[in-house]
């Protein structure tokens, strides 16, 4: 009988130790999981803080660029550097902003469309360059703060009306070029920068 009781006592003691070990493991597992979750939450908070800081920096950069662009337009001393051109047939081409642009310097405008990186074109840089005198320049701001600049350009190789639309608070802009003697309208998208800050390369004019 004593032997049986002793055996039972050993078994119970073993079970108790096993239960304690399991509880300890569960507690350790929970603690590790809680630590991992806490670290994840901390990482997420740091990520959100960095993202918010980057957004603020980007917004500030856009705002400064927008102010500079607005001043340059007002002074007739700007370049719309294009990164995308859309033709009348709907084809859209991504272009080099240093070779596709509209520049305004005082009463002179240059329109250069260079959609090709493979063919030299008439201007030597993959497209066409035309320049001329500006007339009838107007600047309008609507109720939503969107600015539209319109003017005519007349020269040996160009006779067109140009409308430029500026995105409020940034230097982003798009333009429509309406030739007066044909319907080959061209649309470009890009950014407006002060003339002296532009690094465009002007090809040979027609």
Task: Describe the predicted segments one by one.
Residues 87, 118, 158-161:
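Short beta-strands and strand-coil junctions in structured, solvent-facing domains, enriched
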Residues 69, 100, 162-164:
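Residue-level detector of beta-strand structural context in well-folded domains
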Residues 72, 103, 110, 165-167:
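Well-ordered beta-strand positions
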Residues 1-31:
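Bacterial Sec-dependent N-terminal signal peptides
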Residues 26-37, 137-206:
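Helix-rich interaction surfaces within compact, conserved domain-sized segments
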């Amino acid at each position: 009988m004593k032997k049986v009781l002793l055996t039972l006592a050993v078994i119970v003691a073993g079970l108790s130790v096993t239960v304690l070990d399991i509880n300890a493991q569960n507690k350790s597992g929970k603690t590790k999981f809680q630590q991992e979750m806490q670290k994840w939450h901390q990482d997420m908070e740091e990520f959100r803080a960095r993202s918010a800081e980057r957004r603020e920096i980007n917004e500030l950069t856009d705002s400064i660029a927008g102010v500079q662009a607005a001043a340059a337009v007002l002074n007739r001393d700007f370049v719309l550097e294009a990164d995308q051109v859309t033709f009348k047939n709907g084809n859209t081409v991504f272009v080099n902003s240093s070779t596709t642009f509209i520049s305004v310097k005082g009463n002179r405008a240059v329109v250069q469309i260079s959609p090709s990186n493979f063919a030299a074109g008439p201007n030597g840089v993959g497209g066409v360059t035309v320049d001329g005198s500006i007339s009838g320049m107007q600047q309008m701001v609507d109720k939503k703060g969107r600015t539209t600049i319109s003017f005519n350009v007349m020269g040996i190789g160009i006779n067109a009306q140009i409308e430029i639309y500026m995105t409020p608070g940034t230097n982003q802009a798009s333009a429509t070029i309406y030739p007066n003697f044909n319907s080959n309208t061209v649309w470009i998208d890009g950014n407006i920068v002060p003339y002296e800050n532009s690094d465009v390369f002007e090809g040979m004019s027609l």
